[in-house]
Amino acid sequence: MRVLLSNDDGFHANGIKALKEIVIKSGIASEIWVVAPLNNCSGSGRSVGLNVKVQVSKVSDTEFIVDSTPSTSVFLALRKIMNYKPDLILSGINHGVNIGNDVWYSGTVAAAAEGAAINIPSIAISQEYDNKSGEINWVNPQRFLKQIIEMLVNVSFWNKSTVMNVNFPLMPAKGIKFTDQGKYVPCNEIEKNESSDDSNVSYTITRITPNKKNRAQCDGSIKAIDEGYITITPLKFDMTDFDVLTSLNSLK
């Protein structure tokens, strides 16, 4: 199996290194490619570098650094960089979960979505970390990811235009739950940077996902992660609200 790895934390991030090590040890891949952004692109969503020159640097015959977004990285990998399309795309392991509204912002999910757009099985993988210390470990992915990948690639009813979004909890995992995405109200952690010019002010958005205390009433993947479960959520990218569409059509 030819596997393409990408992410949104950047080519040199620890998460994608951990992912590659897991894939190698699992023996599921006969060929591993890594095509990932030069820099951290967290929160970039599905932005693509249109009408700009994108520098691609070759690290080895199967490793490339793209000076652009996660979506651009995979877009180019599938059309210009790789000699053959991959059998599977794995995006991650992201430093932080992608649950609830996160999927709208996530470059990790976006990288996987580029594969799903042309019906390549694609999995986004994210790991919760300690908000206070910033520490992260890969124990849960190391223990469970091989099993999850093997299970998913053998699902006969998986519509390959659907991204499988996998999130690992910080605590030792209690098991796996298949969940809906869920939703939350974004938090307001924004820092105003010091400036002597009131007409030219800068801000830093430090956090979007609410902490556990402020998401206690949330459901779906948010609740399951907070309970200590690995979550798997199938995501499709036709975002039409068909109930509202039906109602709108009744206005004719």
Curated annotation (Swiss-Prot):
GO terms for molecular function: 3'-nucleotidase activity; 5'-nucleotidase activity; exopolyphosphatase activity; metal ion binding; nucleotide binding. It is an enzyme of class 3 (hydrolase). It catalyses: a ribonucleoside 5'-phosphate + H2O = a ribonucleoside + phosphate. Its EC number is 3.1.3.5. Binds 1 divalent metal cation per subunit. A divalent metal cation binds at D8, D9, S42, N94. Pfam families: SurE. Keywords: Cytoplasm, Hydrolase, Metal-binding, Nucleotide-binding. It is found in: Cytoplasm. One of its GO terms (cellular component) is cytoplasm. InterPro entries: SurE, SurE-like_Pase/nucleotidase, SurE-like_sf. Its cofactor is a divalent metal cation. HAMAP family: SurE. Belongs to the SurE nucleotidase family. Nucleotidase that shows phosphatase activity on nucleoside 5'-monophosphates. This is 5'-nucleotidase SurE. It comes from Ehrlichia ruminantium (strain Gardel).
